[in-house]
């Protein structure tokens, strides 16, 4: 069973599972387009993390549950029907685990965040932490995948990185290094863990290069020939913004708080947790070349 299959990561997990010949059922929220999933051969069932009864029906007869669902991606795309962090990422995930336990599911694969972000005080990160704790207390075999930042998200205009125009917003000092990872690589990892005979309980996966935002800009400049104009947002401004936004918009407030946490120290995610699964991770330079070639 896959929950979150219409999202950025979930759609790629579905494709990887289908390619491996796995019998797949996907939970699709009412009103969402599941044609691409049907084309993969997946069985669709209507459900919502806010509707425990629908989750019980979805889990019936299932061996393994994989979930990538969250409210942030949909919210940033303008979907105001997706629900809140409290209802979906905290209570919804807890309800899904309960449904899986009741149905006798054997394994639960969950996408999470690095531990440093879980300690950020961001509501979204706290929901991830609560779900990890709930899984640890469960009788189900759990596999937690803590992923570093997605290349497709962090090197996009959505977060102020406009490589075409040569403009970038740097939050905080911009010195801490992350292992920016391809969504496809994370998806292939989750698909592999869903069917592995004896998977590890925890993986902390990242890309092959430890890079600061300035390092990443240098790579894009070398590939595209475009220098960057940088707008830096100081940490005190971010702190005030996180407190102000957190009161009116917990989702955007969470993003700012997690950005503050990521700016404090280098990521502990490991490329070895990808390569151990037989995955050759895509580098940031490869991604920059891919984007550059797509526009020529």
Regions found by a protein language model. Give the residues of each.
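Short beta-strand segments at enzyme active-site cores
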Residues: 106-112
